[in-house]
Amino acid sequence: MTKTSILEMVKEYTKTQDLRIMNDLIRGLEEDIRNENNKANGKSNVAKAIKAITGNKENIRDQFKTAWLHNGRITALDGYRMITTSEPVNVELQDNAPINVTPFLEGFGYATLEELETPSIGDLKTKIAMDKAEGKKGSLWIWDDGSTRIAVNTKYLLDMLTADPFATIRMTAGNATAAIYFNDPDALVFGILLPVRIAK
């Protein structure tokens, strides 16, 4: 929030005594404090990615509008992607988990999955910009090994790698519709992204 916007809200509250204005001001200041703390502690990338998920306009499920704690890890999902982290990131948390994510995190044999090349943040941003300039409705990032073509929403992939640019990306060999997994060597951040169906 800017100093000008804060001043205007205080003036409006003084004039109307509308508690909704004061509540909005408090929420805005709390958000600013969280962002400052994240930046100071070097956690802004994970926080930014989680906020991209909980703030997804396509996310129509209210219970996924905020993150929650799962086994001590901050977790967020929107039906397309999920991020869970053990890092102490300052984001808004709800009290109860809206869904049991344990089945998504256990028993899939991550180490046995096939590794995909991890694109750079710069390459993803360039792809999004080029597709937008060409008037495309959305942007798809495609891995093609000659036998399997796997496509994902480029913006969602960018969000996942914003949380951890050096994550290893793995997939079920030969399955273009199975979930794609992201992991870092220290297991601080773990993610899942669903692919987009495209013509073979």
Question: Which residues make up each language-model segment?
Answer:
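DNA polymerase processivity clamps
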Residues: 2-200
